[in-house]
Amino acid sequence: DGFTIVPGVLGDPLLSELQSWSQDVFERVPVDPRYRYQGSDIHVYTPDRWQLMDREATHQHFSDPIVQKLLDQPEQKQACIDLGLEDVRSAGGGLILLSKPAFGPPLYWHQDFMNWNHPEAAAPWPTKIFLSYYMSDTTRENGCLRVIPGTHRRRIDLHDVLPNAHTPEIQAIDDLDHPIFADHPDSIDVPLNSGDLIIADARLLHAAWPNQTDQRRTLVLAWHDVFSFPQPPSWWEGEVPDV
């Protein structure tokens, strides 16, 4: 399907620490209106990674030791091992805070994968994944995740009308009746509890419902590379396709 859920991976004290920390961030950091559909786009890095970047901190980019705590979390690493994910490594040494404010709009359908002109785009196994946690329980009412299973490997009609996910064009769309917000017949809701780990292939079409509550709904997302393309997973038994 292109995604999986591992319940209850993130627990206290780290879950409570992340909840308090992320709430504090949004109390002091202004959110760029360009990211109204995501809710925010705040990148936070490990201190070691930040030192290598040699840049000035801004509201959108800064470092915090809590990032390393999450990346090193033993239960998360074990979940990846149990799923057969090999050579999992942080893509950039950071995480992204995506927080839909009270009564925030929906997030459009999109794929986050960017290396479409490379053979890895056709690989039958993932090469880039996100590992994410919601800081509160999610439902359709407060903007839970939506996915279209199988679209990491299968083209559908929606692909023909989607602008590039990483350009101003899609951010500039104001019509909430546009197909990028549609309730696609193959889509499913993915409600989660706080602390549940959701892992998804970057090629998977996904979106989120609007937040119709008066409470913020925050997601902590960390991109990871997985497997070492072009080498297949060690457990791969089928013929390796010529991609």
Q: Where are the model-predicted features located?
A:
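Short, conserved beta-strand element in jelly-roll/cupin
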Residues: H118-R140, P191-S194, A222-V226
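A short secondary-structure junction signal
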Residues: P105-Q111, H118-E120, E141-V147, I156-D160, ...
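Short edge-strand/loop segments of extracellular domains
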Residues: L98-P101, I148-I156, W223-F229
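Non-heme Fe(II)/2-oxoglutarate
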Residues: R28, D32, S40, D157-V161, ...
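Non-heme Fe(II)-dependent double-stranded beta-helix
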Residues: P7-W109, F113-N117, W236-V240
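Histidine-centered active-site/metal-ligand motif
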Residues: H59-H61, H110, H152, H206, ...
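Generic beta-strand structural signal
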Residues: E86-L95, P105, T127-Y133, G143, ...
